[in-house]
Amino acid sequence: MNTGIIDLFDNHVDSIPTILPHQLATLDYLVRTIIDENRSVLLFHIMGSGKTIIALLFALVASRFKKVYILVPNINILKIFNYNMGVAMNLFNDEFIAENIFIHSTTSFYSLNYNDNVINYNGLSRYNNSIFIVDEAHNIFGNNTGELMTVIKNKNKIPFLLLSGSPITNTPNTLGHIIDLMSEETIDFGEIISRGKKVIQTLLNERGVNVLKDLLKGRISYYEMPDKDLPTIRYHGRKFLDTRVVYCHMSKLQEKDYMITRRQLCYHEMFDKNMYNVSMAVLGQLNLMNNLDTLFQEQDKELYPNLKINNGVLYGEELVTLNISSKFKYFINRIQTLKGKHFIYFSNSTYGGLVIKYIMLSNGYSEYNGSQGTNPHMINGKPKTFAIVTSKMKSSLEDLLDVYNSPENDDGNQLMFLFSSNIMSESYTLKEVRHIWFMTIPDTFSQYNQILGRSIRKFSYVDISEPVNVYLLAAVYSDFNDEVTSLNDYTQDELINVLPFDIKKLLYLKFKTKETNRIYSILQEMSETYSLPPHPSIVKVLLGELVRQFFYNNSRIKYNDSKLLKMVTSVIKNKEDARNYIDDIVNGHFFVSNKVFDKSLLYKYKNDIITVPFRLSYEPFVWGVNFRKEYNVVSSP
C-alpha cells in the first residue's frame, strides 16, 4: 500500500461517513497493479478492516476503463454489496460508469455461463478486457465457479482481485488454487503440498513456500486492523492451551448414545455431522439418521421416555431437564442472570435448529415473530426472544439483522438471542453483542476467528469499556477432567483417539493454527509498501476524504485559509489548480459531516467558507426521491 497517502492524515476521525487511510492507500496499490500493470492481486485483509469498501471503490475507478464483474457467495451477501455500493458512490467524489459494473451471486453467474452443466465457451468473449472481483475467494474452489474462473483466466487473460481474510489459510489446497488462478503458470499441487495420513498433516512444503513467494511477488496486499477501539474479550471456563474452554460433562443418557454413535463411526468422526449432533444433544433414533426429514414425518414417535417427536415438533419433560444436552443445560442455567445480547454459533443447521427451537421454547424463551415460550421470561414488559439463522433464510435475514443491530435493541429487548449456522461467519456485522457462544466447535481456527469477527470489530460498540464474554463449550465424558496444557502431550494417535470429540476438534484447531500463523507471516512479509504521490486516478477521491476530515473540525474559515490550501496542495502541487479545486467544492456545495452541525454543505459567505446544516423535508405523499444521477449498478440475484 502507499504509505505516502497514510502520512497525509493526522488523527483521522472514523466516526463519520469516511474512507479510512489504509483503504485509500490500498486503493492506490490496486489501481497501479491491476489497471496499470494488468496483474492479479490477493487482498488479504483481516476481518473488520473494510475489504468490501476497498473493492467497491476500486470497481468505481476501474469502471472508467473496463467492465468490472463482482462475484459474491450468495444472495444475502449480494444485498450487502449493493447497499455498500451506494455508500462507496457517496464517498467517491469522482466520475464513474455505473453501467460497467455487474454484481452477481455465484449461482446466477453460473446460470449465465453454463448450458446443461457445460460451459458456454462462445459467451466468454464478453469478459474480454474486463476485471473480476471475487469476494470470499476461498469459497469458489472445488466447484463449478472455480472451474469457470480458471477457464476465464486462461481464455481471456484478465486480472482478478481476490478478497479473503483468514479462511484462505484453512488448507494448503485452497492456497494452491489461489496461486494457480493469480499466476500465469500451472501449479503441480503434488510438488507444493505435503500430505500425511491425517488432515492436520496436510501442509504447504518448502517448495510450496518458494512457489508462493516467486509467483505472487508484488501481488499481495496484507493488512490487519489495529486492536484499538475494541472491547476486551473475557474467555470463560478452564484453561485449555492458550485459551479457555467450558467443560460440559455429559449425563449418563447423553454419554450412552454418544458412545453408540461414535462406535458405529469408528475413528473417522472428525468431520462427521453425526458427531457434531450428539456432542450438542442426543435425540435417540435421530442420532444416526442421514435423512432427518424422514423421521420428522413421524407422529408421536418416542425418542426417550420423556421426549417425543410429532411431525417435526419435539415435546416432553426432557427439554427442561436437559439430560440430552450438557451444553444446553449449562447455557440455559447461565443465561438467566446475564444481561445484553447473545450470539450463538452452531454448525449443524437442520438437527441443531430443531433442538434449539424446542429447548428455548420449553424454557421460557419466545421465538421472534413466532411461538411464545412456556412461562415466558420478560424484559421491559416484553418476552425475551430468539431467532435461528441458517442458509435456508433468504429475504428475511436482512430484516432480522436490522432489528438485532438497531440501537433500540442494544439491551436485547426486541431480539436477545441470535443463533446462527455458518452463514453468519462471513460478510455480516453484528452490533452490541455481549455474549458469544460456540455450541459446536468450528472446523478451523480461521473460522473461529471469523465468527468472533462478526461481532468484535470496530464501530460495533458504543461502550468499549464493557467486556465481551466468550463461551467455547465442549461436551466431555462424565469423568473427563484432563488439563490440556501442551500440544506435545498429544502427538500419538492412541492418545488422541480416546479423547471426547469436542476436545479432539479443539486440538485440531490448535494444530492447524501453527500452519495458519506460518502462512500469515509469509503473506505479511510479501505485502509491499511504498511511498509515492497518489495515483492520478484517485486524486479526487483522496481530496474528498481530506476535505471531509478538515471540515469536521472547522465550521467556518476564511476563503483563503492557509491550512486548507496547504492540505489541498499536499496532493495538488500547483497552487492555482489547488485554488480552483477549492472553488469547485464550495460552489458545488460539497457534503461534509461537521462536529457542531452534523450533516452540512459548504457555502461561500462573503469572504468565508461556512458549513451549512441541512435537513431533507418532504410532503407526506412523496414516496421517494433519487438524489443521485448515477445509481444504476447492474446486478442480478
Curated annotation (Swiss-Prot):
It is an enzyme of class 3 (hydrolase). Its main location: virion. Its EC number is 3.6.4.-. Keywords: Activator, DNA-binding, Hydrolase, Late protein, Transcription, Transcription regulation, Virion. Apparently non-glycosylated. Disulfide bonds: none annotated. The keyword Hydrolase applies. The keyword Glycosyltransferase does not apply. It is found in: Virion. One of its GO terms (cellular component) is virion component. It comes from the Viruses. One of its GO terms (molecular function) is hydrolase activity. Acts with RNA polymerase to initiate transcription from early gene promoters. Is recruited by the RPO-associated protein of 94 kDa RAP94/OPG109 to form the early transcription complex, which also contains the core RNA polymerase. ETF heterodimer binds to early gene promoters. Heterodimer of a 70 kDa and a 82 kDa subunit. Part of the early transcription complex composed of ETF, RAP94/OPG109, and the DNA-directed RNA polymerase. Belongs to the helicase family. VETF subfamily. This is Early transcription factor 70 kDa subunit.
